[in-house]
Amino acid sequence: MRISKRLVLLGLLLSLVVRTGHATMRVVQKEISVSRALAGRVLVRGTDEPASGVTVELCSSDWKTVVTSTKTDENGHFSLEQPATGKLFYIRVSAPGMDIYEFRVRIQKHTAPELTIHLSVAT
């Protein structure tokens, strides 16, 4: 019984949706391990087309500082330089007319798989 309650709570945390103006902000808690760089690809939800020109920011744990940022290339790929290991950071993924996604990450020394982020068109 306790396990199922924890799973439900975890599911709620992973699917928290907050309305912000015209865009929806999805806050997803995800801990990943990163070796040399935090890399991934941003796709448009529903079509899986690459999302080019999307801003990907690595923010400090208090959200006050953008540690590093980049934009996706024409194929939706991005790569951020590795910050200090063992620390908690947030990733913010945004583009005009698209929902905003924010992820919590803890940087470790191990290798991580490439992230795939699906952005939805804002409604």
Residue ranges and their predicted role:
Residues 6-9:
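N-terminal export leaders
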Residues 18-37, 41-47, 120-122:
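Beta-strand-rich domain onsets/edges
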Residues 62-77:
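Short, acidic Ser/Thr/Gly-rich low-complexity loop/linker segments typical of extracellular
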Residues 105-112, 118-122:
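Short beta-strand edge segments in extracellular beta-sheet folds
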